């Protein structure tokens, strides 16, 4: 690796940590526990470079209870300002996380048909177009005389220039049938959400801590040492600064 490449690598590495620092010191009001969490993940012991690029060893790191760390972060999300703004929301609003996604602006995921249908089922104003048949099982039915109205509203929600028809919307529903997200029931204009979709769109999924935990910590992974992370950082950090002191 040439000196120029080494400099670029070192600069890119420092830039990455600068971005992390900027994100962790913004204008948001963090809880004390969450600030402790940020301090933990940003903790980096100082290591001096030596004459060998491969001789750098990480300093001894204490072993942390990773569930406690994750819990601190979760408390920020679920017990801070976000939770306070959601705790008084009615069921009709709570089951519509897609609405929050839409407000994010550029770069946000587009609203999908199954999300729109699920949202409409909890909207009293849409009761004349779509209704639950068995809410617990996720079975719903389009109202025959107003199915075209529902399709038209869906097209407008998507931002289509041409008018959306029920026939086109039904074609999309058949595609969901192939993937298993929504299946057709042997009853006129009746469909069923899959269990996975119901869980994904449920309030408990939107606000539950357990899902947050399960994505970060495996059941048998009670404790996690930060040695590996620090080793990677120390190796690059020390090598970069050592190489900067060598004449190219």
Swiss-Prot record:
Residues 111-194 bind DNA. GO terms for biological process: blastocyst development; cell differentiation; regulation of transcription by RNA polymerase II. Binds DNA as a monomer. Keywords: DNA-binding, Nucleus, Transcription, Transcription regulation. This is Transcription factor Spi-C. Controls the development of red pulp macrophages required for red blood cells recycling and iron homeostasis. Transcription factor that binds to the PU-box, a purine-rich DNA sequence (5'-GAGGA[AT]-3') that can act as a lymphoid-specific enhancer. Regulates VCAM1 gene expression. It is found in: Nucleus. Disulfide bonds: none annotated. The gene is SPIC. One of its GO terms (cellular component) is chromatin. Belongs to the ETS family. InterPro entries: Ets_dom, ETS_fam, WH-like_DNA-bd_sf, WH_DNA-bd_sf. GO terms for molecular function: DNA-binding transcription activator activity, RNA polymerase II-specific; DNA-binding transcription factor activity, RNA polymerase II-specific; RNA polymerase II cis-regulatory region sequence-specific DNA binding. SMART domains: ETS (SM00413). Preferentially detected in fetal and adult spleen, lymph nodes and at lower levels in bone marrow and fetal liver.
């Amino acid at each position: 690796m040439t000196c120029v490449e080494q400099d670029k690598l070192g600069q890119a590495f420092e830039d990455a940590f600068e971005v992390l620092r900027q994100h962790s010191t913004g204008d948001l009001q963090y809880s004390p526990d969450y600030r402790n969490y940020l301090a933990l993940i940003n903790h980096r012991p100082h290591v001096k470079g030596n004459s060998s690029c491969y001789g750098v060893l990480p300093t001894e790191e204490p072993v942390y209870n990773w569930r406690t760390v994750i819990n601190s972060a979760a408390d920020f999300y679920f017990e801070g300002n976000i939770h306070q703004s959601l705790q008084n929301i009615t069921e009709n609003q709570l089951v519509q996380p897609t609405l929050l996604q839409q407000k994010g602006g550029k770069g946000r995921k587009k609203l999908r048909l199954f999300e729109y249908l699920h949202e409409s089922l909890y909207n009293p104003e849409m009761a004349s177009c779509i209704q639950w048949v068995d809410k617990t099982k996720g079975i719903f039915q389009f109202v025959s005389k107003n199915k075209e109205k529902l399709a038209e509203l869906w097209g407008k929600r998507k931002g289509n220039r041409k008018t959306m028809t029920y026939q086109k919307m039904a074609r999309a529903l058949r595609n969901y049938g192939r993937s298993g997200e929504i299946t057709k029931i042997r009853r006129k204009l009746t469909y069923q959400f899959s269990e996975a979709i119901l869980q994904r769109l449920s309030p408990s999924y939107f606000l539950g801590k357990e899902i947050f935990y399960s994505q970060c910590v495996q059941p048998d992974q009670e404790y996690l040492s930060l040695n590996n992370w620090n080793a990677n950082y120390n190796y690059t950090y020390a090598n970069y600064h050592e190489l900067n002191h060598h004449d190219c």
